[in-house]
Amino acid sequence: MARNHSAPGGVVSPDRLRDLARLRRVRDRIDREYAQPLDVEALARGAHMSAGHLSRRFRAAYGESPYSYLMTRRIERAMALLRRGDLSVTEVCYTVGCSSLGTFTTRFTELVGMPPGAYRRTEAEATLGMPSCVAKQVTRPVRNREVSLTGRGVE
């Protein structure tokens, strides 16, 4: 059963505002603590929600699950570390908070379009001399959902 979270006249209800504030805190925690051992259960406990409720509300607000958002943050950070070129793929995997090299490699390849080792070899040269803030922006991973919505990645 769907609930209407807007008050009459299109004004957002206080309950909806509180819900959005809790979701923002969860997202901010993921952004800050992405390298820590986080999972949806721990995030939900911190937001005083069940894991299922958090997942549903997070997806409704941000268009992806908390786990997907966490993995994307980890992959974005991994991309920056791989561009530097001074860490191995395994070191980068553990530095960004992934506990499985296989899962890291699979997710990295899904988001970036190439395995982390290949990315390290090609992108370190491609972004040489580029300010890190610019390199981060131009090499940001594009999810399939974003490609279909924005046309990014289509040449």
Describe each region flagged by the PLM.
Residues 1-53, 60-61, 65, 77-155:
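Alpha-helical bundle regulatory/interaction domains
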Residues 68-70:
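Short, basic-rich loop-to-helix N-cap that marks the start of a DNA-contacting helix
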